[in-house]
């Protein structure tokens, strides 16, 4: 059996020109949105990078550049579904995914199970293969000042 580990990170800043955020493929009510070329889903973007990294296929920007208008306002679940095809083509499967959301606000706990279900559906895996946890920065830095959200994702692939 062959194993590969990938790590992904993403961050986006809040903007007052949007309401609500998209995170883990679901909409979360909030007074602001995330500034981005696509839908700004930092969790899916980091997950895409983790999978691509484990496959040695670069990063999300290589495959879906934010300079390409084709991807303007794109639902990030599309990116994840395309990367799932790459995963299948390389004959790897996901063993598990571990995600950390770093946000002062909004509160994530009420939304984690829906995020897990959404990601599991797109990736065609079991919900118990995905862990999502959230933390704050104790009001330190740009995240603590509620200026944005960051995520880290680690995935383990096997063949």
UniProtKB/Swiss-Prot annotation:
InterPro entries: MECDP_synthase, MECDP_synthase_CS, MECDP_synthase_sf
Catalytic activity: 4-CDP-2-C-methyl-D-erythritol 2-phosphate = 2-C-methyl-D-erythritol 2,4-cyclic diphosphate + CMP
Involved pathway(s): Isoprenoid biosynthesis; isopentenyl diphosphate biosynthesis via DXP pathway; isopentenyl diphosphate from 1-deoxy-D-xylulose 5-phosphate: step 4/6
Function: Involved in the biosynthesis of isopentenyl diphosphate (IPP) and dimethylallyl diphosphate (DMAPP), two major building blocks of isoprenoid compounds. Catalyzes the conversion of 4-diphosphocytidyl-2-C-methyl-D-erythritol 2-phosphate (CDP-ME2P) to 2-C-methyl-D-erythritol 2,4-cyclodiphosphate (ME-CPP) with a corresponding release of cytidine 5-monophosphate (CMP).
Name of the protein in question: 2-C-methyl-D-erythritol 2,4-cyclodiphosphate synthase
Subunit composition and interactions: Homotrimer.
Residues reported to bind a divalent metal cation: 10, 12, 45
Main EC class the enzyme belongs to: lyase
Source organism of this protein record: Francisella philomiragia subsp. philomiragia (strain ATCC 25017 / CCUG 19701 / FSC 153 / O#319-036)
HAMAP family reported in the protein's UniProt record: IspF
Keywords from the UniProt entry: Isoprene biosynthesis, Lyase, Metal-binding
Cofactor mode of binding and number, as noted: Binds 1 divalent metal cation per subunit.
GO biological process: isopentenyl diphosphate biosynthetic process, methylerythritol 4-phosphate pathway; terpenoid biosynthetic process
